[in-house]
């Protein structure tokens, strides 16, 4: 069996605003909001499910308002990378070459590809790269 990530829950202060920004930056569509999630379909096997309501999962209480920053990394093609970088720049958002340099307005070039990092709503750090991290 092939293992694929099916979905991940992204804590947000405002699930709709966070999902809309993510969809806009990545050139994706946000699904109509139903229930507690604002979903963005990333590809045929992955959705980013933005949630802004606390929930008690028996022994695991979960509150998006108290969740720390998460890091989400995406591998994309050159055309998608250029589009995402262009939309980040058009919004006047800071971006950079590394997780500790995500505001230096530089594009990292390593492993034969390009990488940028930038913060989105709720201070999550997104990484967009053109080469998989497992490549060399």
Q: Where are the language model's segments positioned?
A:
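Amphipathic alpha-helical segments
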Residues: 14-29
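Short, conserved charged micro-motifs
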Residues: 17-18, 79-84
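Short secondary-structure junctions
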Residues: 27-33, 93-98
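Short beta-strand micro-motifs in enzyme catalytic cores
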Residues: 38, 70, 112-116
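Helix-adjacent hinge/juxtasegments
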Residues: 61-80
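Vicinal oxygen chelate
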Residues: 86, 91-136
């Amino acid at each position: 069996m092939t293992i694929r990530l099916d979905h991940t829950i992204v804590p947000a202060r405002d699930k709709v605003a966070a999902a809309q920004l993510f969809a806009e930056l990545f050139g994706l569509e946000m699904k109509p909001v139903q229930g507690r999630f604002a979903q963005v379909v990333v590809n045929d096997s992955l959705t980013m499910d933005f949630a802004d309501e606390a929930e008690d999962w028996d022994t695991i209480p979960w509150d998006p308002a108290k969740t720390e920053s998460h890091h989400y990394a995406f591998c994309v093609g050159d055309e998608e990378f250029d589009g995402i970088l262009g939309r980040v720049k058009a919004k006047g958002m800071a971006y950079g070459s590394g997780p500790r340099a995500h505001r230096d307005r530089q594009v990292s070039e390593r492993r034969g590809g390009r990488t940028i990092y930038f913060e989105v709503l709720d201070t999550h750090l997104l990484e967009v790269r053109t080469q998989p991290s497992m490549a060399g």
